[in-house]
A protein has these predicted regions:
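Signal peptide-directed extracytoplasmic domains
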Residues: 25-26, 30-189
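N-terminal type II signal-anchor transmembrane helix
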Residues: 1-38
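Bacterial extracytoplasmic/cell-wall-associated proteins, especially those involved in peptidoglycan
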Residues: 124, 130-135, 139, 146-341
Length: 341
């Protein structure tokens, strides 16, 4: 072979290698995503390779999808599909995406426990954020056996959910989710908080139950220790709490703007007009501010309170019933003036 032919042959080889490298780069390393923003692929436990392909196809460019399918065909992935929540970055190539999904390299999400009133609402929210079905969550929270495993019953299980933000994997199992919530709850109850509760004659459940009422009475964090102190005074003196939010909870009508006398006779253990002491469990998941307001309540002599007539969300406090009636009349007139029924 002449020198000229050798050079031509080498040039052809180099050209072919460049073309091959370009093809490999184009299909496996150029951007897989069809969007410029991060996308998430959610793979359920019952997904197979076909359903994964169906889910990921709308997210991909045509060349990226071709590269992905090639990798799928020449791997064990069809037999090893892993559930999870997988991030697809705008600059990722098909190889990076495939490797992440095949190896189960999912990205955790941040789940914030909401301050909801009922466990069906909690189940619905958590179910919308995690792979766990909301009906499965609600069934567990309504099961005395499950609740007792964590030291609660179906009326107090809300106490286990501290409204913080937690990082966890989307495909966490129900058991592991509940275990995590119990662990976080135990961590929340520091020695300082437990001691303050004990000094009041309270435990975790009683503290959270009162905090739930305080939170329903006011959203003003600065006023919560005052409200907590007022209810604590009533508990110590043996007076019924007479907390209107417990009537809403007993009636399961949270749209009520006013509580009328005929509503106060509702037959429910949560009716704090008919029953003395705390209700048998919280009427919502309270805020951390609400919990700490109970533990750090203001010591005062007030036994009554009524929403202020200026609708500021704060209250007029009173030491005597006569004084309270005057405050209540001012608030009633303000409600009537606004046509609130």
């Amino acid at each position: 072979m002449t020198t000229k032919n050798k050079r031509l042959y080498q040039a052809i080889i180099v050209f072919c290698l460049l073309v091959f490298s370009g093809i490999v780069y184009y299909y496996f390393f150029c951007s897989f995503s069809a969007k410029d923003t991060r996308q998430y692929l959610y793979i359920d436990d019952d997904d197979n390779v076909d359903s994964v392909i169906y889910k990921i196809k709308p997210m991909a460019t045509s060349h990226g999808m071709s590269g992905f399918l090639t990798l799928v065909r020449h791997s064990s992935y069809p037999e090893t599909v892993r559930s999870g929540r997988y991030a697809i970055e705008s600059g990722d190539g098909a190889f990076a995406v495939f490797r992440r999904i095949k190896n189960g390299m999912q990205e955790p999400l941040s789940l914030t426990i909401p301050c909801v009133r009922t466990m069906d609402k909690l189940a619905g929210y958590v179910g919308s954020k995690l792979m766990i079905d909301s009906a499965q969550i609600y069934h567990a929270l309504s099961d005395e056996t499950v609740c007792s495993k964590y030291g609660y019953d179906t009326l107090t299980i809300a106490c286990m959910f501290i409204p913080n933000t937690y990082d966890m994997y989307w495909n966490i199992s129900l058991d592991k989710f509940l275990d995590r919530m119990k662990k976080e709850c135990s961590g929340f109850w520091t020695e300082d908080r437990l001691q303050k509760a004990a000094d009041m004659g309270f435990d975790e459940v009683k503290t959270i139950t009162l905090a739930s009422i305080v939170d329903e009475e006011t959203t003003n964090s600065a006023e919560k220790p005052m409200v907590a102190g007022m209810y604590y005074n009533r508990l110590k003196s043996g007076m019924p709490l007479q907390a209107d939010p417990t009537i809403k909870f007993a009636l399961k009508d949270f749209s009520l703007k006013r509580i009328y006398h005929n509503m106060l006779s509702v037959n429910s253990p949560f009716n704090t007009y008919r029953n003395t002491g705390l209700p048998p469990g919280p009427i919502r998941i309270p805020t951390i501010d609400g919990i700490d307001a109970v533990l750090n309540h203001v010591a005062h002599d007030y036994l009554y309170m009524c929403a202020k007539e200026d609708f500021s969300g704060t209250h007029n406090f009173a030491k005597t019933y006569d004084e309270h009636l005057k405050n209540a009349e001012k608030y009633s007139r303000a409600l009537n003036a606004r046509g609130i029924k």
